């Protein structure tokens, strides 16, 4: 099994458990150049809030879009947008990525901005 297939298998297992809880989830995806985050409704059919380093507003705040500082900016932005829509608590879906580096930075930043998980 290759690295990507292993990550997808871990992500599927975690998403199944979150779906059983019926919780709104904060989904993180990372590539070498960008970081993406979405708050998805419990039924899985609606994106409540989203932020990524592709957006011009976030790209202008950071020097490079693929590092920890960029992930912190995305975490803060997605948390603020979710709170505006009335979402205060989420389940953190790391998409099979290790809770380390950019993924952890995004999570901590979202917590500091007021999102509970």
From Swiss-Prot:
GO terms for biological process: translation. GO terms for molecular function: 5S rRNA binding; structural constituent of ribosome. Keywords: Ribonucleoprotein, Ribosomal protein, RNA-binding, rRNA-binding. Pfam families: Ribosomal_L18p (PF00861). The keyword rRNA-binding applies. One of its GO terms (cellular component) is cytosolic large ribosomal subunit. Signal peptide: none annotated. InterPro entries: Ribosomal_uL18_bac-type, Ribosomal_uL18_bac/euk. CDD domains: Ribosomal_L18_L5e (cd00432). Part of the 50S ribosomal subunit; part of the 5S rRNA/L5/L18/L25 subcomplex. Contacts the 5S and 23S rRNAs. Belongs to the universal ribosomal protein uL18 family. NCBIfam families: L18_bact. This is one of the proteins that bind and probably mediate the attachment of the 5S RNA into the large ribosomal subunit, where it forms part of the central protuberance. This is Large ribosomal subunit protein uL18. It comes from Vibrio campbellii (strain ATCC BAA-1116). The gene is rplR.
